[in-house]
């Protein structure tokens, strides 16, 4: 008996109002039946390929390359399609063209003597690759991905077989005409972009787009124009969201981080932040101060700053760091419930002797020049500092590019995501030592597990979207800073953020930040199962996907934990972490055959990729293999389609029994 035959007129009476609305889209029996056929067909297609990336930290060139080569999938498909019919050098050339069509075309045109012949060969090759990557999608979905100007032509090339004698000449004429009408370049670019788009069906960014790298704004530009993605906010993302919400402590932190790694371009060129007031203040205040410990951490082999500029960045770095400590103390005093009074450390300095007194011990300070700190009231901003904070605040609040990127983060992002039985979050779900969920008080009420992450998500949105001056917004703006460095914050979950100690104290013991229990307990399968169940993602093929803590592959650490229940996929996209991890990042790939982890070696540069065909070397590890291919019907999207089909079947019953009249 079919599902439709179980639907009776009596059973749908309560749904008639909704079915009347549905009938506007499907006004006849024929329309509803056709849609059911289409949806049933989609359910039996292989699931699309999902890519998971995390901790990009502003490394835009490596990130963009991984999207272009689909973590090695494009190269693999080119090898499968052409096998021994093309030389390795030719396959490499084709891959580079697919990744960087505009740039590669310029190089080809400068060297090729018979360009029309090259166009003919290349267009035929691209059609074959495009046919392969589009084969798991419906024609309708492919059509929606096509550039409007070439939509009809590409459809003809994709869906007509050149093997058939009657069609061979037809396809050749299409390709020849593309060349003779001087449209080959534009058509090749369109085909290459289509291949990139179809190879990755959906992209999950599991946090930390921002941080030390130079191009977080470029990554955000890429994502804002990407076809299908979501973001699980990381601690560095939250810091920028706090800055965009108007939290001055967050603003000071993001500027300090940019100075620490010598990345002024992200602020000035990327977001139009005016740093001149900070530069003027720093030069005046620290004119005779070498500011040695504030020298930016950067690869001086790649440095593009002269000595004078480096000196200025160093002074600006010190100036904003001291301002940050003062601004943070204001929040700590305003919110005693945060329990962070122990992070007010300027008051623990003996300014006369140049020592830091902490828990009964004395530590010699690495820098003792504090011209803006009043020992009697160390957290009071000077008049000049307060004026500077106001100017920088204005600059952040009026950056149109920053507003655009933050809207993107809020629209496509959240604290966590459950997708196809996988639970994605950047850092932690705070736990007690016994593995139970840690109860965290927020404004007098306790939250834990999923409730805690939901509450954090709500507060972050309140901080950005609510009207100025409202009490809820004021608290939320303070809480967004707490999310960055608070001991019970799910995006931090450490006992302290040792920023002051790392700058001013030599003793490495004081630099240590003790991680919460989550980071050890997540190795246990039962704990992971408990977390998955809490978020409604339990099942034999459910997993937690984490970032945040780099996997020290070089020391033998594995990204797969808890008997395959949890994957930590921070492998070192950030160049600064690569000596620690031994690799240059992971991509977790989830396709119809199962899950595999792609381990990347360092990306040299975009220029070398274009000119020399240097690709990222990647190693694939199969984590989970499905003996039966996973179809759309097995996914979250499939469940939605099944519901739509059921509703359409109800509509058919309504039409056939006269409860709703067809609109013929």
What are these regions (language model features)?
Residues 2-664:
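Feature recognizes metal-dependent phosphohydrolase scaffolds
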